[in-house]
Curated annotation (Swiss-Prot):
It is found in: Cytoplasm. Pathway: Amino-acid biosynthesis; L-arginine biosynthesis; N(2)-acetyl-L-ornithine from L-glutamate: step 3/4. PANTHER family: N-ACETYL-GAMMA-GLUTAMYL-PHOSPHATE REDUCTASE, CHLOROPLASTIC-RELATED (PTHR32338:SF10), N-ACETYL-GAMMA-GLUTAMYL-PHOSPHATE REDUCTASE, CHLOROPLASTIC-RELATED-RELATED (PTHR32338). The keyword Oxidoreductase applies. One of its GO terms (cellular component) is cytoplasm. It comes from Shewanella frigidimarina (strain NCIMB 400). The active site is at C155. Pfam families: Semialdhyde_dh, Semialdhyde_dhC_1. Belongs to the NAGSA dehydrogenase family. Type 1 subfamily. This is N-acetyl-gamma-glutamyl-phosphate reductase.
């Protein structure tokens, strides 16, 4: 049984992956940690999330002694921390010999030049970055097995890339257009005016400047137009994507392209049927639905996931299981 430490466990994704690991007979939770200045240190996870009342874990401060204890006892560490925090912690734990599964964006770009623009910091660990694998589980499983540094994808990129990557050989030079709506949990647990009950409303944000746009483009290998929206629901993502396919592409070609997921139990693909968020909430699943107009060459594909599950925690667990071969 592999032992997993979870850092940043007081947030939505940290608590979610704690629940998933706790329920998996292949793994044990070494401990839950928050920063030393966190107001949540010393509290029980169930005090923050009564839905997890069956788990008796306490949130410990990540002191130097705690880090040494993790290295001595754990096989892997999950980082559900801010990007700049993960930057340093991931490198330190990797250098101590642990497998690192980072839910932040600190290791998703291979190009160090991307980080100042999109994350506001210089990447100070290019040696560790060079070992990082992008943890899109259905596409990079062999690489995930071979490295100890896994950058778990963002929620919007997971929904978008799962829909688009099978179509890559058929895409024209026209940019795919991605319109995606996420539940409020995508903004995190900290109180903010725009996510409060009386203020939240369906609205676009990060227009032509969201950091997930270059993440999608980098791992698709093609530029995209990406517009995220805040939805007035708790969790889930629906991405509706319009693409132009090369002349001569047939419906049969598209169906064959999506057959790449025939042996991927988490991904369900339907032709001329479209998914809804409610069908994937609280599951690790991705539901895809597509329709193609061969006359115009345009295809619309919709992708639905739970932003806290396939968009973060359950994909993190997928990567852990792939890496350890369980």
């Amino acid at each position: 049984m592999k032992s997993i430490a979870i850092i940043g466990a007081s947030g939505y994704t940290g608590a979610q992956i704690t629940s998933l690991i706790n329920a998996d007979c292949n793994f044990s939770v070494q401990g839950l940690y928050v920063s030393e200045n966190s107001l949540d240190k010393g509290r029980k996870l169930a005090d923050l999330y009564p839905t997890y009342s069956h788990m008796a874990y306490t949130l410990s401060p990540l002191s130097d002694d705690a880090k040494k204890k993790i290295v001595a006892e754990a096989d892997a560490v999950v980082l559900a921390t801010e990007h700049s925090v993960s930057l340093e912690l991931a490198a330190w734990f990797y250098q101590q010999g642990l497998a690192v599964f980072d839910l932040s964006g600190a290791y998703r770009f291979a190009d160090v030049a991307q980080y100042p623009k999109w994350y506001g910091f210089e990447h100070t660990h290019p040696d560790v970055l060079a070992q990082a694998v992008y943890g899109l589980a259905e596409w990079n499983s062999e690489q995930i097995k071979q490295t100890r540094m896994i950058a778990v994808p963002g929620c919007y990129p997971t929904a978008s890339l799962t829909a688009l990557k099978p179509l890559k050989p058929f895409l024209t030079e026209m940019y795919p257009v991605i319109n995606a709506v996420s539940g409020v949990t995508g903004a995190g647990r900290k109180a903010q005016l725009h996510t409060s009950f009386c203020e939240v409303s369906l609205t676009p944000y990060g227009v032509l400047g969201h950091r997930h746009q270059p993440e999608i483009a980098t791992h698709l290998g093609q530029e995209v137009i990406f517009t995220p929206h805040l939805g007035n629901f708790k969790r889930g993502i629906l991405a509706t994507i319009t693409v132009q396919l090369k002349p001569g592409t047939t419906e049969a070609d598209v169906a064959k392209a999506y057959s790449v997921y025939d042996n991927a139990p988490i991904v369900t693909v339907k032709h001329n049927q479209f998914p809804k968020v409610d069908d994937v909430v609280n599951t690790p699943n991705c539901h895809l639905g597509w329709k193609y107009d061969a006359n115009s060459g345009y295809l619309v594909v919709a992708s639905a996931i739970d932003n806290l599950m396939k968009g973060a925690a359950s994909q993190g667990l997928q990567c852990i299981k792939i890496h350890f071969g369980v």
